[in-house]
Structure formats: C-alpha cells, structure tokens
Amino acid sequence: MNKGCGSGSDSCLSSMEEELHVLAVDDNLIDRKLVERILKISSCKVTTAENGLRALEYLGLGDPQQTDSLTNVMKVNLIITDYCMPGMTGFELLKKVKESSNLKEVPVVILSSENIPTRINKCLASGAQMFMQKPLKLSDVEKLKCHLLNCRS
C-alpha cells in the first residue's frame, strides 16, 4: 500500500505540498529550528511554539476568550511535538488535542531523543500518529507526509 512512499517518491509529496501546515513544538531552540528548517525544505508551512502551553494558545485551547481558534484549527494539518518539555510534556499536549472535539482529527507526532518502549506505546495508545527519534531527518518528513496522504485517501 505504501508503494514508492518510503523512497521519497515525488508523487506522494507533491499532492500534499500545498496544504500541509505543521505546528512544531519544542522547548529547545536548536531542535525547534532544525525541525522548522527540515519541514520548510519539504515545502511545509511551519508555525513554531516553544512549549505545550503556547501550542494550546495557538490552537485556541489555552484562552477561553480566544475567538479565532477554529481559524487556526483549519490551517493546522499536523502537530509535531517534543515529548520532554517543562510545564507540559508532549504527551500531555497530545491528550489535550485528542480531547478537543475541534482538534481530535489532527495527527500528532511525538519526537524524543530517548527510545523508551513504554513511553512510545503510551503515546501511540493515546492517539499519536507516530513516534519518531530525534534528530528529525528529511527522510522522516517524507515518510510522514506519505503516511498522512495514505490515511486521507
């Protein structure tokens, strides 16, 4: 079913390039900039947030008075978040997104520098689309875009 996707096939990428808007969440500036750069190289529109609370604010879940939450939700096709962040972990962000009626369909990918099977399983069981090892690579983004394309078709 994934023919050509794992190899970076242009057909998989080209059909999503126009629409994929990613919210990238990481407390580490260097990691956040790396993710942003790789996503932009892959023709994604990128919005960044330095922590889970900022991400929730952007998505309209942080401030009850925020009125443009649906506008942002419609624009975000994917959330990529670091697992380990102060204040709110990527797992907690994942749970908030999946609890929201407006956001539960938005795929969430968790990034971590630690390969801990129980953590990975917990995230996947709670609705994460994928769990990826840091550092994020261009080939990871290509596979992810193809995976999302297959899920939508």
Curated annotation (Swiss-Prot):
Identification of the protein by name: Two-component response regulator ARR17
Alphabetical list of Pfam families matching this protein: Response_reg (PF00072)
Alphabetical keyword list: Cytokinin signaling pathway, Nucleus, Phosphoprotein, Transcription, Transcription regulation, Two-component regulatory system
SMART domains the record matches: REC (SM00448)
Coiled-coil regions, chain positions: none
Organism whose genome encodes this protein: Arabidopsis thaliana (Mouse-ear cress)
CDD domains from the UniProt entry: REC_typeA_ARR
Stored Gene3D superfamilies: 3.40.50.2300
Example GO molecular function: phosphorelay response regulator activity
Family the entry assigns: Belongs to the ARR family. Type-A subfamily.
GO annotation, biological process: cytokinin-activated signaling pathway; regulation of DNA-templated transcription
